[in-house]
A protein has these predicted regions:
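Short gly/pro/ser/thr-enriched loop/turn and capping motifs at secondary-structure boundaries
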Residues: 84-89, 244-246
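Active-site cofactor/substrate anionic-group-binding motifs, chiefly glycine-
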Residues: 66-85
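An N-cap/entry alpha-helix motif that binds or orients negatively charged groups
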Residues: 2-43, 107-112, 116
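A gly/proline- and charged-residue-enriched helix-loop-helix capping module
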Residues: 81, 88-132
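Short, conserved acidic/polar surface loops in the N-terminal third of protein domains
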Residues: 66-70, 88-95, 149-151
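Conserved small/polar residues in nucleotide/adenosyl-binding loops
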Residues: 263-265
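Conserved alpha/beta-domain cores
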Residues: 50, 58-61, 71, 112-129, ...
């Protein structure tokens, strides 16, 4: 069954394949996998126990539409988003391109999502506390494309969503939002870190906050980010988003490359 579905989906447009997968999960067309918990795979981070190290990263379930089905597939955690305050269509299509020979994809999606109102409602409707008490939920947040001050959007998102997840991710790494990666420069990064931590304190919250970074930053930026993170007790960094280095796929398409290319960075 899986092999047949996989062959069919690979023949279709990549974004259409993704949308079909979401619809299939919504309809319950997937195998429910019963996993036996093995203590040797467990890891406790920030006081939260991850049953296994296998989870689903942000980008698949952008709108928190299929939380329960994803966790029923056996993942110990899922990261939802990236979500922005307002709905956003993203960049023009086609915006996902496959390169099977190179085991790579290029995407220029641009934070396409239905916005935080729909996102919040979907999480509340999933009854996570009743269905998956032992699972971990991450919430990945980012700014709208036309936002002038990124902290304004991050504040809106944090205030609305921090109670709904086990950890928050600040996405500063997408190459498909103009100017976003500039926030990884030391002065900008430190400003965001200190302001987000202050916002957490103002809400009397202890939720872990992670920052997702780019693979394309300079060695000096890597050093600066590391030192700033240590100095400010950052809970974690997520390495990494897609790269704009297209040497392995030899393409002039807009967007970021994921897949095998990242191993060599």
């Amino acid at each position: 069954m899986y092999n047949l579905a996989h062959r069919i989906l690979k023949k279709l447009d990549p974004e259409l394949s993704h949308n079909i997968s979401i619809k299939a999960l919504k309809l319950g067309i997937y195998p429910k996998i019963i996993c036996k918990n093995t203590e040797i795979l467990e890891q406790t981070i920030w006081g939260r126990t991850f049953k296994t190290p296998i989870g689903l990263s942000a980008g698949f379930d952008k709108n928190a539409e299929v939380i329960n089905p994803i966790l029923n597939l056996g993942f110990s955690f899922t990261e939802l988003g990236t979500v922005t305050p307002l709905p956003q269509k993203g960049n023009s299509k086609p915006r996902i391109h496959r390169f099977p020979a190179q085991k790579a994809l290029i995407n220029s999606l641009g934070f396409n999502n239905k916005g935080m109102d729909v996102f919040e409602r979907n999480i509340n409707n999933s009854n996570l506390k009743e269905n998956f008490q032992d699972k971990i939920i991450g919430i990945n947040i980012g700014n709208n494309k036309d936002t002038v001050e990124i902290l304004d959007d991050l504040k809106k998102l944090f205030d609305r969503l921090y109670r709904l997840g086990d950890y928050i991710v600040i996405n500063l790494s997408s190459p498909n939002t103009p100017g976003l990666r500039d926030n990884l420069k030391s002065q900008n990064f430190e400003k965001i870190v200190t302001n987000i931590h202050r916002l957490r304190d103002e809400n009397n919250s202890k939720i872990p906050i992670l920052f997702k970074i780019s693979p394309d930053i300079s060695d000096q930026d890597k050093k600066d980010i590391s030192l700033i993170s240590l100095a400010n007790d950052v809970d974690g960094l997520i390495l990494t988003n897609t790269t704009v280095n297209k040497s392995m796929v030899n393409e002039k398409l807009e967007g970021g490359v994921s897949g095998l290319s990242l191993i060599h960075i």
